[in-house]
Amino acid sequence: MEFSIEIALPSGKKIRVKELKNSEYLSIIKFTENRDFKGLNDFFEALYIRPDLNIIDRIYLLLYIRMTFIEPDINITVDNKSISISVASMLDKIESSYVDLETTIEVNGIVVTLDLPCISYYETVDDLLIATIKHIQIGNESIDYNELDDEVREEVLSNLPAALFGRVTSFIQTIQDNILNCELIEENKSLGIDGVAISLMSGNMLEFISSMYRTDLQ
């Protein structure tokens, strides 16, 4: 039986994950060195990420795994001096920035529940918009969108009214208005450290995560 831990996520969900193996960590480093963020995303999804986890839960989960199975601190080298920064402090900041924005809209009798996007890598704005769709109610038919495979998702989307996507775009703006940049590493001028802030809705979020999986940063 493999060792595993249960992680409580900012949304209130819990997930049990198995220990990261050395071979898996080496694969992560290879994806990182080749800047293959799509491949890295697919790798993380196969290992750890459930389809129903939103983007903030995913950031939190991947940093928690880094803290637990690799090292609890991140070492930053400044002027030949190594400075340790706690990953736990980053997790605290992500958790404190979490806002529940789930909302329901109705267009032409179709009721759609929107929430923080269940995505950790996207190449187009359309990918981001679609990832906010959580649940669809059409008459007596109830659809959990996150549980559908890609082919069925495309079929469902093609039958939704065009007016819906204007409402989804407005919801994305609501997310951006409520979830601002999160400063994970505070500026320390006396030590020569620049502050590091990430947008929790940024398309380069996975690039940031990949850098965190290195044990030392320059």
Predicted features by range, described:
Residues M1-Q218:
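Long C-terminal interaction/binding lobes of large macromolecular proteins
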